[in-house]
A protein has these predicted regions:
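Hydrophobic/small residue at the entry helix of a nucleotide-binding pocket
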Residues: 1-2
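Glycine-rich FAD pyrophosphate-binding loop
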Residues: 11-34
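Conserved dinucleotide-binding and phosphotransfer motif residues
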Residues: 13, 218, 289
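Dinucleotide-binding Rossmann-like beta1-alpha1 core, especially the glycine-rich loop
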Residues: 36-121
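Active-site/ligand-binding neighborhood in enzyme catalytic cores
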Residues: 113-227, 237, 253, 257, ...
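Mid-domain catalytic core of redox enzymes
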Residues: 226-379
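Conserved small/polar residues in nucleotide/adenosyl-binding loops
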Residues: 384-386
Length: 386
């Protein structure tokens, strides 16, 4: 997506970029497919609305921004499923005495949370989300409310998450109000009825499709099954001491091992084929083609970006940490029992569950109105994260 957006922005400035993409489609983890004749998202299905950038981009592309159906989120524990409190930030409740919170954590834990949050705010407010919740509301609130939500969104335990990053302004509001519950309530009031996530009506996969179409309509080129192999400074085009350019992409190809007068960078590409393991990068198997250009944008995952840039800049730094593996299972169900959405738009599974192997379930056709409208009667699309 980053490469598509960059190329589209260049066309808005009157340039005609060349975008190379090693896979056979553009958009990366924003992609669509069909199941039972219904088009749906197989990757990312929406975005957080805390920042307006993605919603603004969708509008500029002529797409309709769609909020999800308002309904409670659910969490599964081995002792049962329960609805999460609606007036909350990352599962942190604005009122620990409310019925939904007491149902989730029990009366004793709710009383302890209220007592902890009544204590004076210390001079040193914990920086990690986990320690912040633990000290102000107790372990049960952290484990049963915050852990599943924060872990599901950020794929990390709360103790490893910076409160200022994942919940901006929350620590400052705690200092100002003297209560974590009141700090959450203030953020909930500010948020109002605005949804915390949104998508594109008809599927988020329409965003890369539209970007692709508009780039080509503006004169840009998109070369799929074409991977970048290397970037190097052009010996004739790059003046001593010149700084790397930060905008633009490749121009005309030149024979391998040659460069054109005036171009600062040589970008060598090659055709690719599908890897037998689709989760791994495609395999370069074509003859090299070198482009000479004044400006290059590198918009890809960290590991290949470091490889591409290693010949032109110092890329030494911390080792990259591999993400946790995850698989998606998509189901089209003929199930009248799901018409009432007994688990709303989906359910998270608490870490440590011994009865359910999945990490989460999303009832896609219930969550997104346009997708639900495209499903036949009693047919439901669900996504299981394993």
């Amino acid at each position: 997506m980053a490469g598509l957006v960059a190329a589209w922005q260049l066309t808005q400035a009157g340039l005609k970029p060349v975008l190379v993409e090693s896979r056979g489609y553009t958009g990366g983890l924003v992609a669509g497919s069909q199941l039972a004749g219904i088009a749906y998202d197989i990757g990312a299905e929406g975005w957080a609305t805390r920042r307006p950038d993605t919603s603004q981009l969708a509008t500029e592309l002529g797409l309709v921004v769609e909020p999800p159906v308002r309904q409670p989120s659910w969490v599964w524990f081995d002792d049962g499923a329960f609805a999460m409190p609606s007036d909350a930030v990352l599962g942190i409740p604005s009122d620990v005495t409310s019925a939904d919170v007491v149902t989730a954590i029990g009366g004793t834990a709710a009383d302890l949370a209220a007592e902890l949050d009544s204590r004076p705010v210390p001079d040193e407010v914990p920086e990690s989300l986990g320690e912040l919740v633990r000290t102000r509301l107790g372990e049960e609130v952290l484990t049963r409310l915050v852990g599943p939500i924060a872990g599901g969104i950020h794929a990390a335990v709360p103790d490893l998450l910076s409160a200022d990053v994942v919940a901006p302004g929350l620590r400052a509001a705690l200092v100002r109000t003297g209560s974590l519950q009141q700090a959450v309530a203030a953020q909930v009031r500010t948020r109002g009825d605005s949804p915390v996530v949104a998508s594109v009506a008809g599927g988020m996969f329409r965003m890369p499709q539209t970007l692709h179409e508009q780039i080509e309509a503006a004169g840009g080129q998109i070369l799929t099954r074409t991977g970048a192999k290397s970037i190097s400074a052009s010996p004739t085009g790059l003046e001593p001491g010149a700084s790397p350019a930060t905008a633009g992409v490749a121009s005309d190809p030149v024979p391998d091992g040659h460069d054109a007068q005036g171009g600062r960078w040589l970008v060598t590409t090659a055709a690719t084929s599908r890897n037998p393991n689709p989760s791994l990068p495609p395999i370069p198997d074509g003859d090299p083609v070198t482009y000479c250009t004044d400006r290059v944008i590198v918009a890809c995952n960290a590991a290949p970006a470091l490889d591409l840039l290693s010949d032109v800049i110092d890329v030494t730094g911390p080792a990259l940490t591999a993400g946790a593996p995850i698989a998606h299972v998509n189901l089209a169900l003929q199930a009248p029992e799901l018409d009432g959405a007994p688990r709303g738009g989906g359910m998270l599974v608490a870490p440590g569950s011994t009865t359910v192997r999945a990490k989460a379930l999303t009832h896609l056709s219930r969550k997104w109105p346009s997708l639900g409208a495209s499903c036949p009667s009693h047919v439901h699309l669900s996504l299981i994260h394993i």
